[in-house]
C-alpha cells in the first residue's frame, strides 16, 4: 500500500502487514539515530501539532520525532490560545493550519475528530487520540515495545487492566493484538468492562477472558498492560468514585507472576502501579516512552513520503 499521504486514524485501517512494516521501519530508524545522532529525511518539512487536550508524552514525542528527522514543528498545546475560543470550527482550524504545514497531528476530546480533520485536508493527518475512541500511534509503540522485548508478539498471553470502557489506548491495542496469535485477558471492574461490540470483534479472532480478578489472572500473563481510571472521561462523578483505586500492581502481586512478566502502562499513572515496581525487571513503561520516538519517526517519514 502507498504510504505517502496516508492518514493514520484508527488501527482498524491497518493490516498485520502494515503494522509489521511500520515496526521494521521504526527499528531501522532507531539504529540510524543511535549511529548518527540526527537525520535529515524531513528537512524542509513542517509538522503541525494540534492538541485540544492535555498531553505530555505524545506531543513531546511527536515533536522530538520530527526534529530527529530534520524537520520543523509548529502548533499549540491547548485550545485556549486559539481561535476555537472565538467559535471557529474544527474544520476551519484544520484547513487553516494545512496552509502552513505538510502533516498534521491532532488530539481532540471528540470521537471522530481526527477522521473529520482528514476529510477536510489534502495533507496527511495522524490521530493522537480522539476522545475515548482510538489512539493508534500509542498502539504501534506498544507493539514495538513488546516485539523488541520478547522478539515476537505471537504466542503471548496479554492482560489489559483498568479502565477498559473509556480507555482509548486499550481499545486500539486490543483491536491490533487481535491480528496476532495471542490470548487476551480483560481485567476490570464490572462498571468499566470493555465495550461489548469490541469484545465480540475480539472473540471472532482470538481467545478472550473477561474477569474482575487481577490476582487470579496474573500467573497466566506474559504482559500486563495497566491503565489509570480516567476521571475526566466519566460523565458522572459518583460512577468514578465507585471504581477509583480498584487495582494496584505492587511487589506482593508480582510474587504470583511469571519471572519474565512485563508490566506496561501508557502513562500518566496515578496509584495503579506502586513506585516500588519501577526498579524491578518487570517494569517496561519507561521503555515504552522511548519507543514513541522511533515509531512516530517512522509514521511521519512514511506519510510524508521521505522514507
Per-segment meaning from a language model:
Residues 1-307:
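Structural/interface elements that position substrates and couple domains in central-metabolism enzymes
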Amino acid at each position: 500500500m502507498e504510504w505517502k499521504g496516508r492518514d493514520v486514524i484508527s488501527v482498524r485501517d491497518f493490516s498485520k502487514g502494515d503494522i509489521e512494516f511500520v515496526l521494521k521501519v521504526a527499528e531501522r530508524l532507531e539504529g540510524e539515530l543511535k549511529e548518527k545522532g540526527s537525520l535529515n529525511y524531513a528537512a524542509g518539512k513542517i509538522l503541525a501539532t494540534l492538541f485540544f487536550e492535555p498531553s505530555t508524552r505524545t506531543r513531546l514525542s511527536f515533536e522530538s520525532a520530527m526534529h530527529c528527522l530534520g524537520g520543523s514543528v509548529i502548533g499549540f498545546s491547548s485550545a485556549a490560545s486559539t481561535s476555537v475560543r472565538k467559535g471557529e470550527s474544527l474544520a476551519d482550524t484544520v484547513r487553516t493550519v494545512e496552509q502552513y504545514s505538510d502533516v498534521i497531528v491532532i488530539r481532540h476530546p471528540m470521537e471522530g475528530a481526527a477522521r473529520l480533520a482528514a476529510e477536510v485536508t489534502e495533507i496527511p493527518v495522524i490521530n493522537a487520540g480522539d476522545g475515548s475512541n482510538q489512539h493508534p500511534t500509542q498502539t504501534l509503540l506498544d507493539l514495538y515495545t513488546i516485539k523488541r522485548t520478547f522478539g515476537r508478539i505471537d504466542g503471548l498471553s496479554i492482560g489489559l487492566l483498568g479502565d477498559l470502557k473509556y480507555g482509548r489506548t486499550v481499545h486500539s491495542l486490543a483491536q491490533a493484538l487481535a491480528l496476532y496469535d495471542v490470548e487476551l485477558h480483560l481485567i476490570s471492574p464490572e462498571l468499566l468492562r470493555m465495550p461489548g461490540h469490541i469484545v465480540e470483534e475480539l472473540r471472532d479472532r482470538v481467545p478472550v477472558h473477561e474477569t474482575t480478578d487481577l490476582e487470579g489472572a496474573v500467573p497466566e500473563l506474559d504482559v500486563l498492560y495497566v491503565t489509570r481510571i480516567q476521571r475526566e472521561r466519566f460523565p458522572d462523578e459518583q460512577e468514578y468514585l465507585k471504581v477509583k483505586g480498584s487495582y494496584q500492581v505492587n511487589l506482593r502481586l508480582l510474587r504470583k507472576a511469571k519471572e519474565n512478566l512485563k508490566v506496561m502502562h501508557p502513562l500518566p499513572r496515578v496509584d495503579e502501579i506502586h513506585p516500588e515496581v519501577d526498579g524491578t525487571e518487570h517494569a517496561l513503561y519507561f521503555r515504552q516512552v522511548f519507543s514513541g520516538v522511533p515509531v512516530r519517526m517512522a509514521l511521519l517519514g512514511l506519510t510524508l513520503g521521505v522514507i
